[in-house]
């Protein structure tokens, strides 16, 4: 009730503020002038409670009364109710001011209604009191059961968790008013889940009551009930289910299924071969069930175990090849342990599970065995045929010791005999092939299926059998104005023999060129040399080319020397002294032409091309004069209409060959109906084509057909035929229907179109005269 009075006071402040302002203004005015008005008594609204319970089933429920203190009960005032819900949810008695609720209300949908009230004097129609707001509050009743809004609930908790471990918290919600008594105060209880779980009554927190083992049961269903009104009689309740799953912890160690495993292995099996599998089981799941298999150190020389992490099996593999003749059985001990073991769970894994594995070696017929995995031999090049290279050896590892035969796979350079001795079958050249990669095959004599192969590498050693030579072809030029001591070329040499660090070349001029005073050579002692001029000035006309013989020797044993010729061209370098243009001049001079001759040849070529272009241009201009207009294509038959088509007859062209034939046979046929739109077009004729007799005969035949055709349409049409023509200067004739009347049209201009239109001019001229 106190809250309601406070709310009324706060809502009434805005309504009283104008009155307070008016009072203040009145007091201010009293200071300035004497009071003239009578003392007024303050009036206002009078009402009692404004509460209505929700879910009232009566059709009309009285809420309270609005009344003005000016109302003396003579029914002279009219009360009106305004705002949301007025007239639909709430009504007011216009005479008494009583307010009624005409609908069932639900506080959870709307708990407050703010309305406005007016009181009007019926006689004057004016408001007696200022419009006022008031609040109707819907009272709450316990009509909503608690609901769990976050369903479904699911929680995961580790197995073997201690008592009191928090699992999950469930929360229910009640739509009733929490400030109205105990309607929304909830109490939680456990309907299903004992004795492993418990729930706190006020918070809904679920906790573990006793330890649980996932291997016995991995999930539990717990049912929680929530009651409002703190569980008092008449309270409403709601329930929810919680699925609680136990997560696995590594509280179980792996154990072998068998205490003894028997496996076999062939002595021919290569290393890495899988011999068999062993298996242990673990009640845990996930990474807690991942295992690591191993072999005790004393037995791990020949065999090993790897773990297949997908199947959790131990795969026994061959670590080292076995020999039946040396040892035909083995015994090893394997153990298994978990891969992930937390420190707090080490008490469950103090001792690893073990098993014993017996492995039997199976005897097989083995191929020959070489003493070495590969052989490397060396031989000098240019050795004679049949020279010794080396010896390979293989034996039969079996007890019967079968004889061995040797062979070299795809080799035409080397031979091998039954003793494994390798010799050359051809001469060797290191510059052709420095290494030979071969394959030696050993085969048992009594069992040719037993074959072994190993690689054989033969290196051909170098001897000094190639003389040095120029590393490239040199184009050397010297200017006519070159001075003495000028470097004109740097040369280097190569040797096809094997390159060594101390490989060195020596450069000298030949005995014949030593006395030559034009050029000299200086050895740079780094396998290069420079060519220098030995005089000042050269003459291109007298001595255009010099040939110098250069001796290049190596430091091999024995030393080899070669003679190489360097060609030096004399070049007119001009004032710049540069030899960049010497190559072009050399090409010109090699053709035997001087510069003046080449210029003359170029001028002649330009004149010839100019004459050709001029001739082509004149021919093109003549063609343009013969055919000045190209507005249309040349055709054998040309039909042109200015109307929108004349039907199928537009596509029927005549054959010009028929016009030129001596005998013309034509059949009369009915003309198809065409549109009445007529256009005509005259064309220019270049006075070329068949003679007029042919056209005259053709036109007369067409005229005869038109005059005798009973199905001809009632309009004229003009068809123009041209022979290789390009148009007419006369222009287009107007359609006969384009004129408004014959009286408005003058056809005198037809007389100006020439003799070709004379007949047409006579026809229209006579028609005009007859009309006149």
From Swiss-Prot:
Keywords: Calcium, Cell adhesion, Cell membrane, Cleavage on pair of basic residues, Glycoprotein, Membrane, Metal-binding, Repeat, Signal, Transmembrane, Transmembrane helix. PROSITE patterns: CADHERIN_1, CADHERIN_2. SUPFAM superfamilies: Cadherin-like (SSF49313). Residues 44-148, 149-256, 257-370, 371-470, 470-581 form the Cadherin domain. This is Cadherin-19. The lineage of its organism: Eukaryota, Metazoa, Chordata, Craniata, Vertebrata. Residues 22-43 form a propeptide. It is a single-pass type I membrane protein. It comes from Homo sapiens. Glycans are attached at residues 57, 74, 419, 437, 508, 515-516, 534. Cadherins are calcium-dependent cell adhesion proteins. They preferentially interact with themselves in a homophilic manner in connecting cells; cadherins may thus contribute to the sorting of heterogeneous cell types. It is found in: Cell membrane. GO terms for molecular function: beta-catenin binding; cadherin binding; calcium ion binding.
